[in-house]
């Protein structure tokens, strides 16, 4: 057991985590050169296309160190985006140490800090690694000082390597062996295994990735899931070398996968403890804190026949992605669907794409909203995650919106632009610290503004140099109103949104104009209105298509013309009272982009 090392690789987006993992696998011979490809751990098509890691992946390698011993390295490659920070904290719970990879050209960025503090809070050994030293812009000395200055860990001795060219990888492996502590645990105690991740295999059922904390797990053992009390037989178990390899035993301290023929998706929730059926452990391992979704949106299948398939797909996906929340919802405009909770907009996009690709569904998303705390006049406090759930205005004492604490790191040159952006987003500055050429800014900004397009705007005002990390801070009273969109006097529930009162006229006008472009012209006028309660704040009209009824009249009597026009007018009036307007798909998507195009 003293030769096992469990660690995660953490870093900011694009600092080279996945490439470093590739090199470690190659150096330790986990895959033959023929099977090796770039970012071999990013196995999902989506990950390859976008060039980002979404799912944390684990690998077991054997490394023969310079002291002649062979060490077993279990490592987990984690995502860097703030939306997937939950994957990172789960991976860290299974480890004793973490490699903090920092790009020697870019230096410390916001995610570097956030992930590093998560690791330190969990009492992990953090080993800094300076990557990308082959770049002409690399300045390892400056970056090492930056790490000490901003993060506060000793980095002068940090290994300098280049994951792309393979320089210094041996040193990284030696560092891992010497710096990261071996796992602690009692091989003879009752079995306790922590479920780090699960996914659904159509042939095997639920496959779980586990870390054995105490005891051992053998093939054929009877195990019990502690939260549900259900017992299962272990059919297969093994490790990833990134390929799935079967073994007969998982020893104390190891990380591996287990198949117990669990058909039920909720059979082995992530963060749960497995123990042996005959000799159960007395206590549950401390799992992970549940993350609360920050962004909610309605997802609806385009054809109502897909509803069943959509429900199953969501179930399978939520097993693999523990931070996804969903509950059934129905809308008059869109039929039956689900209200889903996500950690951020990128997360939402990814989930939607995965559903469309892996499960072959066509979906519509409604405008994303955050959770508001609403105090009603009878003193009851409710949490509202969708505009349609908001009680009528005269029943509300106050609405409180969620405030996010945003930590930004950026070069001094862009400070002015970024502050202007934060103020525009109704932000309040709480802290500002200079580190050499970098500035660390802390702002409290309403979550609704952060979630919408803050990250994109921040990147564009700072030419990509600023980085962001945010988390929920508290609820705070604000003057929020619900804007309803009415088409010919009918409210369309899927188009409603909750906005700040000052922005309401502007957002309403923008939406109405956008809808006017997208709704096809009919035989009668279509009035599109935005309203707060009964007060109309914006309106536009899609003009009717009309025949020229006077074409056949040449000169002659005006009363004849009047009669024909009058007749047309009556016909249009009758059509309008009967006709209903189909709102096309694009109109719902337009809402997502309101305010983005500037």
Curated annotation (Swiss-Prot):
It is found in: Cell inner membrane. The keyword Protease does not apply. Required for accurate and efficient protein synthesis under certain stress conditions. May act as a fidelity factor of the translation reaction, by catalyzing a one-codon backward translocation of tRNAs on improperly translocated ribosomes. Back-translocation proceeds from a post-translocation (POST) complex to a pre-translocation (PRE) complex, thus giving elongation factor G a second chance to translocate the tRNAs correctly. Binds to ribosomes in a GTP-dependent manner. One of its GO terms (biological process) is positive regulation of translation. Pfam families: EFG_C (PF00679), GTP_EFTU (PF00009), GTP_EFTU_D2 (PF03144), LepA_C (PF06421). GTP binds at residues 14-19, 131-134. It comes from Pasteurella multocida (strain Pm70). It comes from the Bacteria. Its main location: membrane. GO terms for molecular function: GTP binding; GTPase activity; guanosine tetraphosphate binding; ribosome binding; translation elongation factor activity. Gene3D superfamilies: 3.30.70.240, Elongation factor 4, C-terminal domain, Elongation Factor G (Translational Gtpase), domain 3, P-loop containing nucleotide triphosphate hydrolases, Translation factors. It is a peripheral membrane protein. Residues 2-184 form the tr-type G domain. Its EC number is 3.6.5.n1. Belongs to the TRAFAC class translation factor GTPase superfamily. Classic translation factor GTPase family. LepA subfamily. InterPro entries: EF-4, EFG_III/V, EFG_V-like, EFTu-like_2, G_TR_CS, LepA_C_sf, LepA_CTD, LepA_IV. GO terms for cellular component: plasma membrane. It catalyses: GTP + H2O = GDP + phosphate + H(+). Keywords: Cell inner membrane, Cell membrane, GTP-binding, Hydrolase, Membrane, Nucleotide-binding, Protein biosynthesis. This is Elongation factor 4.
């Amino acid at each position: 057991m003293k030769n096992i090392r469990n660690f995660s690789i953490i870093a900011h987006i694009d600092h080279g985590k996945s490439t470093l993992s590739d090199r470690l696998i190659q150096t330790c011979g986990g895959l033959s050169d023929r099977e090796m490809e770039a970012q071999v751990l990013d196995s999902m098509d989506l990950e390859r296309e976008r060039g980002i890691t979404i799912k944390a992946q684990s690998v077991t390698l054997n490394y023969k160190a310079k002291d002649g011993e062979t060490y077993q390295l279990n490592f987990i490659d984690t995502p860097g985006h703030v939306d997937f920070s939950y994957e990172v904290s789960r991976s860290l719970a299974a480890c004793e140490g973490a490699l903090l990879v920092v790009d020697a050209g870019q230096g410390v960025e916001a995610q570097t800090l956030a992930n590093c503090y998560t690791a330190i809070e969990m009492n992990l050994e953090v080993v800094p690694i300076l990557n990308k030293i082959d770049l002409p812009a690399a300045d390892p000395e400056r970056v090492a000082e930056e790490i000490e200055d901003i993060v506060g860990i000793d980095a002068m001795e940090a290994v300098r390597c280049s994951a792309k060219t393979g320089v210094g990888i041996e040193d990284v492996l030696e560092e891992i062996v010497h710096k990261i502590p071996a796992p602690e645990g009692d091989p003879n105690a009752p079995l306790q295994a922590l479920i780090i991740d699960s996914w659904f295999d159509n042939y095997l059922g639920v496959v779980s990735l586990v870390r054995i904390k105490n005891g051992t797990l053998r093939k054929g053992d009877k195990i019990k899931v502690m939260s549900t009390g259900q017992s299962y037989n272990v059919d297969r178990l093994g490790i990833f070398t990134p390929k799935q390899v079967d073994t007969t035993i998982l020893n104390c301290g190891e990380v591996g996968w287990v198949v117990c023929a669990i058909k039920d998706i909720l059979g082995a929730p992530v963060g749960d403890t497995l123990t042996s059926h005959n000799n159960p452990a007395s206590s549950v391992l401390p799992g992970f804190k549940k993350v609360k979704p920050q962004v909610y949106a309605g997802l609806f299948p385009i054809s109502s026949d897909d509803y069943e398939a959509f429900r199953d797909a969501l179930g399978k996906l939520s097993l693999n992605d523990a931070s996804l929340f969903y509950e059934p919802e129905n809308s008059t405009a869109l039929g039956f669907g689900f209200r889903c909770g996500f950690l951020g907009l990128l997360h939402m996009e990814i989930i939607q794409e995965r559903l469309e690709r892996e499960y072959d569904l066509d979906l519509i998303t409604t405008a994303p909203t955050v959770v508001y705390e609403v105090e009603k006049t009878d003193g009851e406090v409710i949490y509202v995650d969708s505009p349609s759930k908001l009680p009528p205005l005269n029943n509300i004492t106050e609405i409180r919106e969620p405030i996010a604490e945003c930590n930004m790191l950026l070069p001094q040159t862009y400070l002015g632009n970024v502050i202007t952006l934060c103020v525009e987003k109704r932000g309040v500055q709480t802290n500002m610290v200079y580190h050499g050429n970098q500035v660390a800014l802390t702002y409290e900004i309403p979550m609704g503004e952060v979630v919408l397009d803050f990250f994109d705007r921040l990147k564009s005002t700072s030419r990509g140099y600023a980085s962001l990390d945010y988390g929920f801070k508290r609820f705070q009273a604000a003057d929020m109103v619900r804007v309803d969109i009415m088409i010919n006097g009918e409210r369309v529930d899927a188009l409603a949104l909750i906005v700040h009162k000052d922005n309401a006229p502007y957002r309403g006008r923008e939406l109405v104009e956008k809808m006017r472009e997208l709704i096809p012209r009919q035989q009668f006028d279509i009035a599109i209105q935005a309203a707060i309660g009964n007060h109309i704040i914006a309106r536009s009209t899609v003009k009717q298509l009309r025949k020229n009824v006077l074409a056949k009249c040449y000169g002659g009597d005006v009363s004849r013309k009047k009669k024909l026009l009058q007749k047309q007018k009556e016909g249009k009036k009758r059509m309008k009272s009967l006709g209903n307007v189909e709102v096309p798909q694009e109109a719902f998507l337009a809402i997502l982009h309101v305010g983005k195009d500037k």
